[in-house]
């Protein structure tokens, strides 16, 4: 099954079955959070610059715990690369904030 949401820039971002399998195999704690992952891309608290043109959508899901969704945008399409949970807000704070400016 293919899921899509719009990024803050209005670009459709895909979550494919293959990427979902990767996310849940590497980060089993995210198995029940597919909708949270999509919601984080659509409505992040902030977007950070990643590596090689990746973007990191970040949303706090519990006090001190952030859901980070790594995705790529092309001109009219995009896709989710991976996602993970972190409590390391200081490492996130070191990245360039893309949105909001």
PLM regions and their residue ranges:
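Ribonuclease/tRNase effector modules and their secretory precursors
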Residues: 1-101
């Amino acid at each position: 099954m293919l899921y899509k949401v719009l990024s803050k820039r209005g670009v459709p971002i895909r979550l494919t079955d293959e990427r979902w399998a990767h996310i849940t195999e590497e980060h089993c704690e995210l198995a029940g959070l597919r909708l949270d992952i999509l919601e984080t891309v659509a409505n992040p608290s902030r977007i950070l610059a990643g590596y090689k043109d990746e973007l990191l959508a970040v949303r706090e899901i519990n006090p001190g715990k952030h859901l980070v969704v790594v995705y790529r945008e092309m001109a009219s399409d995009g896709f989710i690369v991976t996602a993970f949970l972190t409590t390391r807000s200081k490492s996130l704070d070191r990245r360039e904030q893309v949105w909001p400016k």
